[in-house]
Amino acid sequence: MTEQITPEIVAQHGLKPDEYQRILEHLGRVPTLTELGVFSVMWSEHCSYKSSRVHLKTFPTSGPRVLQGPGENAGVVDLGDGLAAAFKMESHNHPSYIEPYQGAATGVGGILRDVFTMGARPIASLNALRFGDPSHPRTAYLLEGVVAGIGGYGNCMGVPTVGGEVAFHPSYNGNCLVNAFTLGILPADKIFRGTAAGVGNPVMYVGAKTGRDGIHGATMASAEFDASTEEKRPTVQVGDPFMEKLLLEACLELFQTDAVVGIQDMGAAGLTSSSVEMAGRGGNGLDLFLDKVPLREEGMTPYEILLSESQERMLLVAAEGKEELVRSICEKWDLDVAVIGRVTASGRWRAHWRGEVVADLPVDPLTEGAPKYHRPMTPHPALPALHAFDPATLPEPSDLGAALLRLLARPTIASKEWVYRQYDHMVRLVGAVRPGGDAAVVRLAVSHEKHAHKGIALSVGVNGRFCFLDPYLGAMHAVAECARNIACVGGEPIAITDCLNFGNPEKPEIMWQFAECVRGIGDACRAFGTPVVSGNVSLYNETEGQGILPTPTVGMVGLVEPVERTCHSTFRAAGDVVALVGSLQGEVGGSEYLSAEHGKEAGRPPALDLAREKAVQETVRRAVRAGLLSSAHDCSEGGLAVALAESCMMHEVPADGSTPAWIGCAVRIPFPVRKDFVLFGEDASRILVSLPKENAARFVELAQECGAPVIRLGAVGGDRLEIQGALSVPVEELARAWRDGIPAVLRRDAAHAGAAAPA
């Protein structure tokens, strides 16, 4: 008996009444429940980008290095000499809040599959994480679970996690963010795509068996959380990194043959989205025979088989006659493999079950014909009052040294050593710069000896507070800071991926934030010549109507050549000159200092002059490549004082302890405005450098050639951070505060750990 489609069933599938009406018009009949499930996931925000697509089309997506832009599993850029890099960043926010370990682990697994599906071997991962107020009872539970999940999956896969960022803010109390980034290397002339080409070609299932885990995960990721959130735990997928490792090696072996026509990861919406998207890209139809799908649970229905998000699975279109070759390779790696369908010329997507057609749908309405909304937009009503705030009315701290210590202990600024110590960042020895610096640097020599001179710089970041106060400017800052981080290691930025995390797009102020952030990213990318080659949108990050800060995370890739000429982010030698490339404005709007010391999140983000920004970056990049610098460190959260303190604390200490873990400096800073504003303001376009005295004159000449201002501040040495007329604090004391920030969050939670975990 066919189940009747009622308004309640439509609503349970996350579809609006007008969307259901569109389905009726497309089909000319009432859909079956299975067909409704297919429309539900394919028209979800997660799969269709129905609220965001009209804005995303404004991104710059092409350039001389772009081999594959948005629309595939990952973007691909040319690294020269026949080599290419595939990379992407994607969110796993909703699952990670419900079940932090598995949510984060399967997020890593999914992004790894997106990259190796392109034909690339993954060589490095990063992540950008957001958690709630450090004192919130659930924060430590989520932090520990997410970090363990990322480490557990990535370490088993043998892919090092080489960097990332972690920040805390009360807006994430009900919605943590887990944005995972992976990069892989492949021959520039052997890119594989998710296309169902060649009528008559077999469609093959490869990987783990299908179970009931993750059903309607894509729909869950397209809705707000409420009091029933815990009931959604069954929609979180369960990962098996050992199975994924086998799948990775099998796919890379298959790519060495002529058997693969197209291949797609079964990610969000599982078999449904992978098969529909492949048919859409190929301009063809597809017939699936669901009784051929390898199952791990008895009694599964066609609906469950199609919408399951079981992990570690691939859908592959093979060249006709190559089925046995595919089968032999997959069985060698102990993977399930089966022919489950055929490419057709019908333009229709059909699912068969035990001799009956259980779904028969035109492909176009599921892909390009999905709804596209121009949602209403209006600036956030709170902004005029926030912009009118005058920080000059605030009292100046009586003890600037104590204020610096408090900032260093803030979990957003504090050392992330507790986090990256749980990741295997040394596996395969790819890192040229250890975690904790401004950007990660990955050597290509490990996998590609002839490219030993090349390295890749990787950076992720965004300041959500800036993006709330001015979405356009805040998003530009995100791109600029990633590029600045890459300049600090001598890299040339070449392209970005993004992960756009926002609240409910049906609220005009949220849609305005989204559109303005997209505009800001686009304009900044045009200025830096860094096209957007891949990305992800995560909407409905709200709980009980409370949304997150707009968080458009940017992941940037740069080329470091030669890789031997890179740079550390911390001071290296006593007697070195300390200088600031950039200027001192004392802009504290939206700063960590304003929030930490005065409880204010107001004002305007610092002004950003892109010409000045590019001049600062070019100065430092050329200086690193010329071997002039001992260290280079971006000034960001916490401002110049925090950058000085962090530069005093060496991140890499010899195992024998022969070098102390810190070194001091003495500087004299000109104070054009209040001292606390100059010390802790987060002015844009600034890099703190140290260099041998004999290189100082050449460095100043180089800065003048590039058009960047340089302020000589002082010298490295001693065991204190001394800022003349402002503060003098032992570096050991600074290090203690900085290194204890994250462990303090976990200790604070220990007393009420039972309240943090679900019952």
Swiss-Prot record:
Keyword presence, ATP-binding: yes
Subcellular location, record wording: Cytoplasm
Residues binding Mg(2+) 1, per UniProt: 90, 536
Ligand binding (Mg(2+) 2): 114, 265
Enzyme class: ligase
Paired cysteines (S-S): none
Gene3D superfamilies: PurM-like C-terminal domain, PurM-like, N-terminal domain
InterPro entries associated with the record: PRibForGlyAmidine_synth_PurL, PurL_linker, PurM-like_C_dom, PurM-like_C_sf, PurM-like_N, PurM-like_N_sf
Keyword Nucleotide-binding belongs to the record: yes
Principal cellular location given in the protein's record: cytoplasm
Residues that coordinate or bind substrate: 91-94, 113, 237, 309-311, 538
EC number: 6.3.5.3
Pathway(s) annotated for this protein in UniProt: Purine metabolism; IMP biosynthesis via de novo pathway; 5-amino-1-(5-phospho-D-ribosyl)imidazole from N(2)-formyl-N(1)-(5-phospho-D-ribosyl)glycinamide: step 1/2
Active-site annotation: 46, 92 (proton acceptor)
Quaternary structure and interacting proteins, as annotated: Monomer. Part of the FGAM synthase complex composed of 1 PurL, 1 PurQ and 2 PurS subunits.
Family: Belongs to the FGAMS family.
The name this protein goes by in its record: Phosphoribosylformylglycinamidine synthase subunit PurL
Source organism: Anaeromyxobacter dehalogenans (strain 2CP-C)
